[in-house]
């Protein structure tokens, strides 16, 4: 496996996945960078895997979970402050969506990110997460319902926006 080519082919998808999990572009970049550093160290073994990109997503998922446990209160404060402005700001809809996704349980957020951001099927998500397809369908259904509820709340509007009554 040519690692440079593997990186070029997978890095954008992996970054989208990490951003979907964290809601923070800087944290997402850190997770992806660490995942590729680990992949580089294991590149010979990784070349033998059927799905090396799935291994990378698993590493990102575990790194994110580790950081959430370690950061605790600091992460809550950072999330309340919102993500830093990226070079090319995301659309208003993306900001609202990510803000709402932060409120979801991690299982729902992960399933939604895999399904909608990485176009993974229910069967692929089930295989990657080690659960039954029915569980994935439940996560997606509950995640969509919770996401709809979050998006319908007034507190997900951009600053300065208000309701006209």
Give residue spans per PLM region:
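DNA-recognition helix of helix-turn-helix
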Residues: 61, 65, 129-153
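C-terminal flanking helix
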Residues: 11, 15, 36, 105, ...
């Amino acid at each position: 496996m040519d690692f440079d080519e593997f990186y070029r082919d997978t890095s954008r998808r992996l970054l989208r996945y990490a951003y979907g999990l964290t809601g923070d572009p800087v944290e997402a970049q850190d997770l992806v960078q660490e995942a590729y550093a680990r992949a580089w160290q294991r590149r010979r073994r990784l070349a033998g895997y059927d799905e090396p990109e799935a291994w990378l997503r698993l590493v990102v998922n575990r790194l994110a979970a580790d950081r959430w446990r370690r950061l605790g209160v600091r992460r809550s404060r950072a999330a309340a402050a919102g993500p830093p402005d990226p070079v090319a700001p995301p659309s208003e809809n993306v900001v609202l969506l990510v803000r709402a996704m932060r409120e979801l349980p991690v299982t729902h957020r992960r399933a939604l990110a895999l399904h909608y951001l990485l176009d993974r099927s229910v069967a692929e998500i089930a295989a990657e997460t080690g659960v039954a397809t029915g569980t994935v369908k439940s996560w997606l259904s509950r995640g969509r319902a919770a996401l709809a509820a979050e998006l319908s709340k007034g507190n997900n509007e951009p600053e300065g926006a208000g309701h006209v009554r």
